[in-house]
Amino acid sequence: DWARLADTIAAADRALIEIREDTPQQRFRVLPEHPADLRALVHGLDGAKRWIMLRELDRWPDFAPLVADILQAVAPVVETRTGAIVKPTAFLFISSPGLVTPLHFDPEYNILFQISGRKRFTILPPSCGLPSRSDNERFHRSGDNLLDWRPELAAQGWPFDLAPGDALHVPFKAPHTVTVGAEPSISLSVTWRSHSSLMQDDAWALNGLLGRYRVRLPAPGARPWLRAAALRALRR
């Protein structure tokens, strides 16, 4: 129900909403100011290249019960692979037809559920070498998770065509790009962290910190807890 969704967004905490648009000046530009009534942005998706993200759905009364049910259902499966679920949350993505989300990576494990419309979700394999060491260090320094696209990456991607009712697991930090089909799209992402991924965060943050002093460390590798412990000691 698009009208109900528009009403829900219009009444929500603006801090939990992020809006981006393609403009002649910049692709995927963050909208610096939200209009007084957000309903028009939802109803006008067809005539724009717009991306609306609702974050922390566990804080939205209309979505929190669904998020809790999904996490309860997937926990027995995912915990055998990623360890205990840490910092779970969820996002709703509402996108204009034809919108292309730039190549990027996310620091979470993710299961994406396609609700309305269609999209092609293309994941790059680890063999592509992304995100690189510099990409990781930049992300943990500034939060910038965008990656440079190179034409040769197109042949390496794994494309998944998603229709309503489909779901897709997106691995931790897997590079991906998304192309929306001919109709507006709604997707739900349920994400979580693991203790290992949080240690990766601290290990990469230590790399970035020492890099400011021209000390270059290799990637954290299989034992990130060593650098994570060092960073936590420095923070005390």
Q: Whereabouts are the PLM-identified features?
A:
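A short glycine-rich, His/Asp/Glu-containing loop-to-beta-strand
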Residues: 85-93
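Double-stranded beta-helix
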Residues: 114-169, 174-175
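A short hydrophobic beta-strand segment most commonly corresponding to one strand
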Residues: 134-136, 182-198
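Transition-metal
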Residues: 1-68, 72, 207-214, 236
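Short, conserved beta-strand element in jelly-roll/cupin
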Residues: 93-97, 106, 110-120, 125, ...
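Conserved double-stranded beta-helix
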Residues: 159-160, 194, 200-236
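A short beta-loop-beta micro-motif enriched in histidine and acidic residues
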Residues: 87, 100-110, 155-156
